[in-house]
Amino acid sequence: MVSVFLSTLLLSAAAVQAYLPAQQIDVQSSLLSDPSKVAGKTYDYIIAGGGLTGLTVAAKLTENPKIKVLVIEKGFYESNDGAIIEDPNAYGQIFGTTVDQNYLTVPLINNRTNNIKAGKGLGGSTLINGDSWTRPDKVQIDSWEKVFGMEGWNWDNMFEYMKKAEAARTPTAAQLAAGHSFNATCHGTNGTVQSGARDNGQPWSPIMKALMNTVSALGVPVQQDFLCGHPRGVSMIMNNLDENQVRVDAARAWLLPNYQRSNLEILTGQMVGKVLFKQTASGPQAVGVNFGTNKAVNFDVFAKHEVLLAAGSAISPLILEYSGIGLKSVLDQANVTQLLDLPVGINMQDQTTTTVSSRASSAGAGQGQAVFFANFTETFGDYAPQARDLLNTKLDQWAEETVARGGFHNVTALKVQYENYRNWLLDEDVAFAELFMDTEGKINFDLWDLIPFTRGSVHILSSDPYLWQFANDPKFFLNEFDLLGQAAASKLARDLTSQGAMKEYFAGETLPGYNLVQNATLSQWSDYVLQNFRPNWHAVSSCSMMSRELGGVVDATAKVYGTQGLRVIDGSIPPTQVSSHVMTIFYGMALKVADAILDDYAKSA
């Protein structure tokens, strides 16, 4: 595990409390690490993966003392690792450690591979992410029902589940004055996942308000609560933090209060390789999993009711493929006998990030982060007619090219997705780009195109799940619109940094700096982006939840089509990208799916 680092910052009684280390509770010693302790046993439910959705669903199921659950997690309990995980200001320091899966993509643009960051440990990626807490546009979630046929997956329903997960703290007067916003009707207060303002106790930088004043002059809404269903605009954001500014990862929220339940067992240091099935008249029924660490050391464990895959958007598709569920062409190449033909591992949608950074003058000193969710017109500016023309003339061509590249399998069904995205951007005023600004002596924008038209894939390369041989191929920028959008968002960030009220605090650009001329065209920005982007690590849709006709892998209750007793319950199932950070969606989704599982359990009792 990462070594523990403890530090205490003493502030006056009047100051907001900065990060204080959390109480250290030895959870790991109460968990299982010996696979023989569970091998051959039978549980009601087996959950493959102890990340955000896995731990949330495990906690909800085991509220019923009659339900026995086993969670199998490759990593360990890491929430005690001190500031490197607990302190939100240490974001990024955990990258490259044993708590980071650090998957490699196949060679992409210019033959570059990219690292895909994902948490390895109980809590999954909530251990290592930026713990930002926003929600998407309501029309995006409504489309899951209206466009993709997933009954019950609409904003009104999901909004209640998302609020049910949350325990929000109202910002202080000083935080509101600095640029935070809070609409109490959009927040839950009785949930498990704490949210509040990030605050290190230092004075607030005036740059947040300067950004708001700059975009307000352009007609952009400011100080919007980003959790109310229409996030377009500029505001400061909430984070998953407790009152001591400690990261509230999924293990701290859902496992720490519940790890001593007698009906909940957590096995660490092991990975699920494949699902075990028996054939029935109704098709294959999941009866357990094979887990272990290598081909010579692995075990079987059995599920009375269901197997629930929660290994994440990069890994859950692989478990299905190792189990014989997937595209025949992929399984044949890996020497796996096909059990069921489903479009597993395609339709994967991740975003891309670039950075525009400048020095801040001494007048801009202080802490703070603000986000600009920009719509289509705000992002593209003078280039909006060109971008609109692409959306109105190229969807058929893009769908054909994507299918030919292996990003999807059906041109007609993919065009439904593309038309949905076009409607969002041109008719529904959804946020198209996110510009995330950090201060503290700088004006730093990390920014990304939120709505990618590129479709990637992740597939196995052998029949042995423990060799860890797979091809993660996001296919970044193989769609021209995605590159244009990322370039336009980058250009917008540079323009905003030195105009309007922001000019007072601008003290010279450091990135791109001299690497890109100041009056760069969108074409020049595109060239720069290709050389300097990174993945955004928000991949979804590799086991899409949509009608089977449109390319779905799971139905509206997260059940894998054509099977019994098998669900995928993680970030691989949302059928679309969204204009937000994804934790709120995943928590709400996990609670909704948990209710569906419990409904089926009640019917079987």
Curated annotation (Swiss-Prot):
N-terminal signal peptide: 1-18
Effect of Y91F: Slightly decreases the affinity to beta-D-glucose
Intracellular or extracellular location(s): Secreted; Secreted, Cell wall; Cytoplasm; Secreted, Extracellular space, Extracellular matrix
Biotechnology: The high specificity, high turnover and high stability of glucose oxidase make it an ideal enzyme for biosensor applications and such as the detection and quantitation of glucose in industrial solutions and body fluids. Glucose oxidase is used in the food industry for removal of residual glucose, e.g., desugaring of dried egg products, and as an antioxidant in the production of beer and soft drinks.
pH-dependent activity: Optimum pH is 4.5 to 6.5.
Glycosylation sites: N111, N183, N190, N335, N375, N410, N519
Thermal dependence of activity, per record: Optimum temperature is 40 to 50 degrees Celsius.
Active site as annotated: H538 (proton acceptor)
Catalytic activity, reaction form: beta-D-glucose + O2 = D-glucono-1,5-lactone + H2O2
Domain of life: Eukaryota
Keywords on record: Cell wall, Cytoplasm, Disulfide bond, Extracellular matrix, FAD, Flavoprotein, Glycoprotein, Oxidoreductase, Secreted, Signal
Post-translational modification remark: Glycosylation has no effet on the kinetics of glucose oxidation or the pH and temperature optima. It also does not increase the susceptibility of the enzyme to proteolytic degradation. However, it plays a role in pH and thermal stability.
GO molecular-function term, one example from the UniProt record: flavin adenine dinucleotide binding
Other remarks in the entry: Glucose oxidasde, as many other enzymes when extracted from the cells, has relatively short operational lifetimes. The enzyme rapidly inactivates on storage at pH 7.0-7.6 at temperatures between 30 and 40 degrees Celsius, with release of the cofactor FAD and molten globule formation. The exit from the protein's native state has been simulated and a common set of amino acids is regularly found to initiate the denaturation (residues 65-68, 166-168, 262, 265, 275-279 and 464-465), suggesting a moiety where the enzyme could be strengthened by a suitable amino acid based modification.
Domain notes: The overall structure can be divided into five distinct sequence regions: FAD-binding domain, extended FAD-binding domain, flavin attachment loop and intermediate region, FAD covering lid, and substrate-binding domain.
Protein name: Glucose oxidase
Record lineage: Eukaryota, Fungi, Dikarya, Ascomycota, Pezizomycotina
